[in-house]
Amino acid sequence: MTVKPEGRKMLRIEKKNAESPIEQKPRWIRNQVRTGPGYEDMKSRVTGASLHTVCQEAGCPNIHECWESREATFLIGGDKCTRRCDFCDIATGKPAELDRDEPRRVAENIQEMDLNYTTITGVTRDDLPDEGAWLYAEVVRKIHELNPNTGVENLTPDFSGKPDLLQEVFEARPEVFAHNLETVPRIFKRIRPAFRYERSLDVIRQAHDFGLITKSNLILGMGETAEEIEEALRDLRSAGCDIITITQYLRPGPRFHPIERWVRPEEFVEHSKLAKELGFGGVMSGPLVRSSYRAGRLYVQAMEARGLELPENLKHLAETSQGATAQEASTLLEKYGPSEETPVTTRMAKTPAQSNSVAATIR
């Protein structure tokens, strides 16, 4: 990606961010590629049918593990977002006209890939009267129609917190409704200026009250403290959040918020313990965990925590949710041993021709 955003002027905050060189990663943020028959089969299906997933296009470090479990993520609503968050690489601008055939195509892609579980995420569409609520609901309906054995997670924007718009999305009944809080109250406005902390919590609360399994995400390393992380976890749990993922912020490029701190694996383990003590049914915590990482596994755990049986058509998900997960902090500690506090050091930012940055998190 280039330093200058495509099709618009740099914002003042982007110019300030660009003054800080790109940071060097500590030794524990490394990804070893492991492929198996499930991944190879998925790859051949995707390549042969010219399908597109966020997993490929964002260069996700977890693609091999998730595809091995036949899980994949799709981005809907276009490639431009009407809001800008300081950690997210999705372009901000005026989106293209709504593609009303997209839900059918996504559902057919999932059918072709024979997925066990899929996460649907997308851009915020403040330009539309319903802010994209129909699209997020319709894609779930189409997936369920064509793929009754595929679990669906719907990771949505906040729809301005409007109950009627959220109700439309809820009524499509995804297996999991997700809305990412991302950060703590003190720095929320700086990181997510078009969102509101309390409104995001209320979105989770409304989904919980509707009866859905709910999920959210926290990104660490943007300036928050341990006490503030605990506060956010408590707030989410009080709102009825069932599943939490906790991850390290990785800066997509020079225009984005500088990394304030590398969070050690030991700290991720402590955050995971706290989340479980607070009553989250599904917890995944580690530097390279992403909000859709091993999502089917977390859904199974959340259902068990609620004392609910998996639907007959999704009982196969229990089989794919066994064993260790490569990106969980506890796994990293077993692999690398204890880690030392690593100060944030920088390297020179790449030129546009050299740059190969990808989104740290997709909201």
Swiss-Prot record:
Superkingdom, taxonomy of origin: Bacteria
Gene: lipA
Residues that, per the record, bind [4Fe-4S] cluster 2: 81, 85, 88
Binding site for [4Fe-4S] cluster 1: 55, 60, 66, 292
Alphabetical list of SUPFAM superfamilies matching this protein: Radical SAM enzymes
Similarity field: Belongs to the radical SAM superfamily. Lipoyl synthase family.
Pathway membership: Protein modification; protein lipoylation via endogenous pathway; protein N(6)-(lipoyl)lysine from octanoyl-[acyl-carrier-protein]: step 2/2
Listed name of the protein: Lipoyl synthase
One term under GO cellular component: cytoplasm
Annotated PANTHER family: LIPOYL SYNTHASE, LIPOYL SYNTHASE, MITOCHONDRIAL
Region called Disordered, residue ranges: 338-363
Compositional bias of kind Polar residues: 352-363
Co-factor: note: Binds 2 [4Fe-4S] clusters per subunit. One cluster is coordinated with 3 cysteines and an exchangeable S-adenosyl-L-methionine.
Transmembrane segments: none
Record-level Gene Ontology MF annotations: 4 iron, 4 sulfur cluster binding; lipoate synthase activity; metal ion binding
InterPro entries, alphabetized: Aldolase_TIM (IPR013785), Elp3/MiaA/NifB-like_rSAM (IPR006638), Lipoyl_synth (IPR003698), rSAM (IPR007197)
Localization terms from the record: Cytoplasm
